[in-house]
């Protein structure tokens, strides 16, 4: 039926199995979005990343996991392995189609749908308790925001969302501070002052 297929995979072997199976198929959907998207992508092998980039398989990852659930990662994987998890910089450099999500409501955090701890985790590569999560995989704030907005819309084929530009639906947030200018350590403190859908204010904090 030409629909995008979404599969969830955490762990090197699980990701490899999903990517290997998807790579055996030709693109079946009509739009520019990936025919298969794989959620989470904890610690993919280089071969899985290469195949995904070549076949146009999309990856959706959530740095909030290492930020919010650091104890579990350290207890089960150890810090050195954990530093290789959610390798955002490597994925971007590979050319694979990539975006962010919060994975709400599953995320173990005070406000699972809050995107700002996720962005902070991607930028600082530090957990809530300060644990180093692999700074070589960090991205800048603008890149993290784009992965959360434009790239997320593109991933699922929403062609008039994700950007503020002529002809788009004017869905946007007004924040209480400039996320591009504040110190990265303050990103999780950002508040939404207003939310606009289709150019109409549907939420105001004041």
What kind of region is each of these model predictions?
Residues 2-6, 13-36, 41, 46-50, ...:
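His/Asp/Glu-enriched, well-ordered alpha-helical/loop segment
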